[in-house]
Regions:
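Glycoside hydrolase catalytic-domain context in secreted enzymes
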Residues: 1-230
Length: 230
């Protein structure tokens, strides 16, 4: 096409993309066909720029009006959140080689202190509110990736929770894609935290597939843990 011909032999420094409405505005439409068309726009531009994985959509619950990323999330309603994320995923993944990353799994509903926060959630609230949207999206659209969250959940780092990753996400929801950490999750330690740092070997043991962005230290830690286990 014209764009491809114009860019042939050129190094792209800036990716000019179509601006679509924020997540909350999309959800207010209650129109999954429209949201899927927005995903189609994203997928088309991903193809054009050679982008294979989109680090979105995010479907955490609007629990507090003080959460600085509420604009990125869809709703306080897990049904709406799941349906919107599924529609967006279908639109993007209709394009060959393009995938979405739904996040942040799970119970990441505030920005302040989120690397040290321990979300205490009952089983009922977890099932009815905080996991439901993820289950809907996985079952209806099978996103290519799921990103775990920075926070702890009932005392366990989400990336280290085999219950969340293997028992619920994979076995119960039927998820088939990759599970990645949020950025530098195994290295987000803080001396002010009452909890230990998330550790790479425990993330791997829980079923995590990809450390982002990863480094040699993480690889060394996992290899040593594997050798010790043998």
């Amino acid at each position: 096409d014209v764009c491809s011909s114009y860019l042939a032999g050129c190094e792209i420094k800036t990716q000019y993309c179509t601006a679509i409405p924020i997540g909350t505005a999309l959800a207010q439409s209650f129109d999954t066909d429209f949201v899927q068309r927005c995903g189609d726009i994203v997928g088309e531009e991903m193809e054009h720029f050679g982008v294979h994985l989109w680090l979105a959509p995010a479907l955490n619950i609007h629990r507090s009006i003080r959460c600085g990323r509420n604009f990125e999330y869809y709703s306080e309603d897990p049904l709406v959140s799941g349906k919107m994320a599924a529609a967006m995923t279908r639109g993007v993944q209709a394009h060959k080689g393009c995938g979405t990353t739904i996040k942040h799994y799970a119970a990441n509903n505030k920005e302040y202190n989120r690397t040290r926060n321990n979300s205490m959630v009952s089983e009922r609230a977890m099932r009815e509110i905080y996991l439901k949207g993820f289950g809907i999206c996985v079952r209806e659209a099978q996103p290519k990736a799921v990103m775990t969250s920075y926070n702890l959940l009932n005392g366990t780092h989400t990336a280290e929770s085999r219950g969340l990753v293997m028992d619920i996400l994979r076995a119960e929801f039927g998820y088939q894609g990759i599970v990645m950490t949020d950025w530098v999750t195994p290295m987000t330690g803080d001396a002010r935290s009452a909890h230990r740092d998330s550790q790479a070997q425990y993330v791997a043991a829980a079923g995590g597939d990809l450390f982002m962005p990863g480094n040699k230290g993480i690889m060394t830690t996992c290899c040593r843990a594997s050798t010790a286990a043998q």
